[in-house]
Amino acid sequence: MKIVRTIAELRQHLSAYKHPAFVPTMGNLHEGHLSLLRQAKPLGDVLVASIFVNRLQFLPHEDFDTYPRTWEADCQALQAAGCDVLFAPGEQELYPEPQTYRVQPPAELADILEGHFRPGFFVGVSTVVMKLFACVQPRVAVFGQKDYQQLMVIRGMVRQFALPIAVLGVATLRAADGLALSSRNNYLTPLERAEAVHLSQSLQQMAKALRAGTVDIAALEQQAMVDLTARGWQPDYLAARRRADLQVPAADEVAALVQNDGLVLLGAARIGNTRLIDNLEV
């Protein structure tokens, strides 16, 4: 595996290839990341991963400074997963001057759910992904569906800017008890880790209610919030949305959406000091 630190060296090295496959990460890799790499490997003639903790997508009170950085373990894991090129720029390389030009996703997608609770998050994500795409120039890019809204934002960006990149979403990998794999799971205490599965279980209960005929989305979401709060969580949202646009479905379209696999349930909640997200397609 070749490790590259500069954009110039990356472009020079990749000039020998025609179909790069790309998996961007922030490091602290787990089996979920490695599953993305394995999916990406046969899709191109060179497999590129990046490690870059992107300051633009963190709010001032969030965990940019404490986000786990596990360089040696990450390099070993990437090599074992078949990565050919690791692009690991420093902040000065990717942002040599203030990033005053930014990608602004539409408010109806970027200012709801995660975007409501993390203002500016999707501007930061879109901007760094656009910049990484410009550096790598992949033919295919692979992302996890755990970050469901992020995947939709990136797909929309690629479509509207006519980027010649196929964006592939890969199903969320889960622990044996159902907890979605996440770098932030490392923050959990043993007691919190045992409790953490209840976020995915809350979404499963919502799905069960929808399949049983529930059409009152507001009441469904409110009850799920109450139930999770009673367990000691601080939920930001537990939401049922249309898969197509992440908007709230009208009561008279819920049944048809459930029947035609047209809904997604999304949740974000804090247990202790750790904020977790998850989703479930219905």
From Swiss-Prot:
Q: Which InterPro entries match?
A: Cyt_trans-like, Pantoate_ligase, Pantoate_ligase_C, Rossmann-like_a/b/a_fold
Enzyme active site? 33
The entry marks the following residues as binding (R)-pantoate, namely 57, 150
Q: In which pathway does it act?
A: Cofactor biosynthesis; (R)-pantothenate biosynthesis; (R)-pantothenate from (R)-pantoate and beta-alanine: step 1/1
* The reaction(s) this protein catalyses: (R)-pantoate + beta-alanine + ATP = (R)-pantothenate + AMP + diphosphate + H(+)
Q: Which residues bind beta-alanine?
A: 57
Q: What is its EC number?
A: 6.3.2.1
The residues that the entry says bind ATP are 26-33, 144-147, 173, 181-184
Major place of localization?
cytoplasm
Entry annotated with the keyword ATP-binding: yes
Q: Which Gene3D superfamilies match?
A: HUPs (3.40.50.620), Pantoate-beta-alanine ligase, C-terminal domain (3.30.1300.10)
Report one GO cellular component: cytosol
UniProt entry keywords in alphabetical sequence: ATP-binding, Cytoplasm, Ligase, Nucleotide-binding, Pantothenate biosynthesis
Which Pfam families would you find in this protein's record?
Pantoate_ligase
- Residues folding into a coiled coil are none
Question: Care to name a GO molecular-function term for this sequence?
Answer: pantoate-beta-alanine ligase activity
Q: Which GO terms describe its biological process?
A: pantothenate biosynthetic process
Where does the record place it?
A: Cytoplasm
Q: Which domain of life is it from?
A: Bacteria
Q: Which family does it belong to?
A: Belongs to the pantothenate synthetase family.
Q: What else is known?
A: The reaction proceeds by a bi uni uni bi ping pong mechanism.
- What's the subunit arrangement here? Homodimer.
Q: What is this protein called?
A: Pantothenate synthetase
The organism named in the record is: Albidiferax ferrireducens (strain ATCC BAA-621 / DSM 15236 / T118)
